Amino acid sequence: MNQPFEVKLEEHWLRDTYVDLLLEYAQKDDRIVALDADLMAASSVKRFSQQMPGRAIDVGVAEANMIGVAAGLAAMGKIPFTHSFTAFASRRVCDQVTLSVAYAGLNVKMVGSDPGITAELNGGTHMSMEDVSIMRNIPGMTVYEPVDSAQLRAAFPQILAHDGPVYIRLLRRPAVRIDSENDEFTLGKASLLREGGDVTILATGIMVAEALLAAEELAGQGIGAEVLNVHTVKPFDEEAVLRSAMKTGAVVTAENASVIGGLGSAAAECLGENCPVPLRRVGVRDCFGEVGLTDYLKEKFGLTAKEIVRAAHEVTERKNFR
């Protein structure tokens, strides 16, 4: 399990994997429909609309209306998949998602693409750091972020089978390959990627690769880091997190999102109530995004392996002085 980790980008863009899966399952299940808000080219849903024109709807720049239409389709037995950038798929439609979908208990799957800093040149207005927090606070919502194409393929049938709203936080570009096809994937259950006895690193999305790089560096310093891919932030896998925290006695979280209300908060809530251990949250700290390429923004907001290593040293030192 603790094999050397090498950063390799997938050839396939994650958005294309998503549309491949939509097409594959839509051919077998006529309940599946796709909705977009004037971003069909950006999401690759245009390809779905060309092959299945009667089952794709572009509502225009009207995201809240898109959620209302999706709720109506779900009420009639369809399984709608909606898409917009995370900023518009979460904060702009929050009331409609809360009332029209979640309160009504409807089976709508919502895709938010370009999560966190990966919005890059679209800048702060399109860069949602708070979407995980928003969606995690809506009753009955499942919040999932695939780490790579292989994991998304494993997750898709489970997302379809889940009777209820799901928010999928989707990187549009090629993901770093984590070899997650070797995992036994279960929605709502964290994946153990690396074993260690000194510190637990909980990561999600693009930060999983950073966590594995950090674990390699820490190993060279004599610190054994256990790495869990918490792909489903809600429901939160308390069992796996507590098992690891009790083993290591120190925890670091890493997320491409605000530390307020997201993975870091979920871990703090779980550990605070069940297993108080030193915790350090790596993520965006109460600020808006800005224009820049991903590598620059990683450094700007501290979303790096270097920052995870620093956090790991901090919590292990605190553990040793308790």
UniProtKB/Swiss-Prot annotation:
Coiled coil: none annotated. Transmembrane segments: none annotated. Its EC number is 2.2.1.15. Part of the sulfo-TK pathway, a D-sulfoquinovose degradation pathway that produces 2-hydroxyethane-1-sulfonate (isethionate). Catalyzes two steps of the pathway: the formation of 4-deoxy-4-sulfoerythrose (SE) and xylulose 5-phosphate from 6-deoxy-6-sulfo-D-fructose (SF) and glyceraldehyde 3-phosphate, and the formation of sulfoacetaldehyde (SA) and xylulose 5-phosphate from 4-deoxy-4-sulfo-D-erythrulose (SEu) and glyceraldehyde 3-phosphate. It comes from the Bacteria. Keywords: Carbohydrate metabolism, Thiamine pyrophosphate, Transferase. Belongs to the transketolase family. This is 6-deoxy-6-sulfo-D-fructose transketolase subunit SqwH. It catalyses: 6-deoxy-6-sulfo-D-fructose + D-glyceraldehyde 3-phosphate = 4-deoxy-4-sulfo-D-erythrose + D-xylulose 5-phosphate; 4-deoxy-4-sulfo-D-erythrulose + D-glyceraldehyde 3-phosphate = sulfoacetaldehyde + D-xylulose 5-phosphate. Forms a complex with SqwG. One of its GO terms (molecular function) is transferase activity. The keyword Cytoplasm does not apply. The keyword Transferase applies.
